Amino acid sequence: MKKQKGYLVFDIGTGNARVAVVSVTGSVLTVEREDIEYSTETLYPDSRYFSPQVLWKQVMNLAKRALSRSCDIDIIGLTSTSQRQGIVLIDQNGNPFLGLPNIDNRGREWEAGIPDWEEIYSSTGRLPTALFSALKLYGLKQRQPSLWEKTASFTSISDWVTYQLSGILTYEPSQATETLLFDVKQNTWSEEMCDIFGFSPSILPPLVRAGTAIGTIANEYASELGLSINAKVIAGGGDTQLAVKSTGAGLEDIVIVSGTTTPITKITEDHGDTKHKAWLNCHTDQGHWLVETNPGITGLNYQKLKQIFYPNETYEVMEEEISALAKEDHACVAALGSYLSAEKNALTRGGFLFDAPLSAHLKRAHFVRAALEEIAFSIKWNFDILTEVTPFERDYVWVCGGGFQSKALTQYIADLLQKKVYVQEGYHQASVVGAAVICNETFQLTEEMSANVRVIEPKDCQIELALYEEWKQTQRFFSGSESKVLI
């Protein structure tokens, strides 16, 4: 029997690393995952890092496990996707030696001292905050000069994976967008941005578009994984861009991706002024951009609350208990992030507001539902900002990502936005499926991927809109000052 063709996809998220085997038809056949081990760098108030050597050993073991469960697949290509903003530093000998994830904020102390904010925004499509890679490097240079001197180059986490597999160092534009060193409108590295941050352009790898066959798998890893030495290593892209790609959404569509954060994106051919209210990103499709608003950390908060309130239960149990609550029974309101602030992922005070003394009817489900509603409210807030920047008249939005495994969240979005919600089959593994889509384009395969789309219709939302207003007041309460809140 002839083996089915497929791909080995590495997906390095914020919370965990995954390796999947995906068929050319987009079916995710096996997925293996483990949490990523981060360490804290005490030289900074808010810093995380990881060991590339430890993570590489981890993902190779995941790859072996995934392949062992997919014996009837002929792997013709390998690719990768990852969290955006995260980077891996490489020394003069070509050895990766330090990983800085998206949640590393070591550059925050120097944000205010960065000059030429308007020039940076005009060129890169974002303001210089600690979220982006250049500020991570800048903080390293200021406080850990010995590590900076050791740095010959750096690349995104997804491009680090393809570097490991092929031995060829590249940077893909949808990831380069997140560095603050990339001219997003011209799709090229910016020497002017390097000058602003005091970096030599020599640290920047060659740019390679998503879907480019970089090379073939190194003999060492072909042998270790039991793959053909002819298997191609293909440039991947940012997890948001590949998730958007998986939906099949077209120009001018809006796609909401619910994961660690929740990007709300519009696909466009235009790279006009985003008025300091949105980011402008390269898409994996040449000539297309994504205009994005993003509330910051969302799904990661929900995951942590599960660990607190439902440590031994599944998400399905959480969903059942949430659905058992009366629609009008809102015993508490959540404020778990600076969702109305211009600064994403900033450290802030937060919590839940509820009546005191505690009601005998207050249950754990009230807290997790409040957190889920907050994700929906933060999406509405950012959706409204996005549609101010770039008008949107369609009666639907696309959604994807693991967060939309919650039927409650999906219905909240339909109700609050008063839009139909389109959910493509495979939505919960969107970045992995999107990786298979770009690989198919590389191999010029025309296999039909699933076109099964579920449609969620909006319902009356008067209760939700009233709660939305209450949530905004709760955000004000925890912000401590209305001047910090964009409302």
Curated annotation (Swiss-Prot):
It is an enzyme of class 2 (transferase). Induction: Induced by sulfate, part of the yoaDCB operon. Keywords: Kinase, Transferase. GO terms for molecular function: kinase activity. Pfam families: FGGY_C, FGGY_N. The keyword Kinase applies. Its EC number is 2.7.1.-. GO terms for biological process: carbohydrate metabolic process. Gene3D superfamilies: 3.30.420.40. The keyword Hydrolase does not apply. Coiled coil: none annotated. It comes from the Bacteria. Belongs to the FGGY kinase family. This is Putative sugar kinase YoaC.
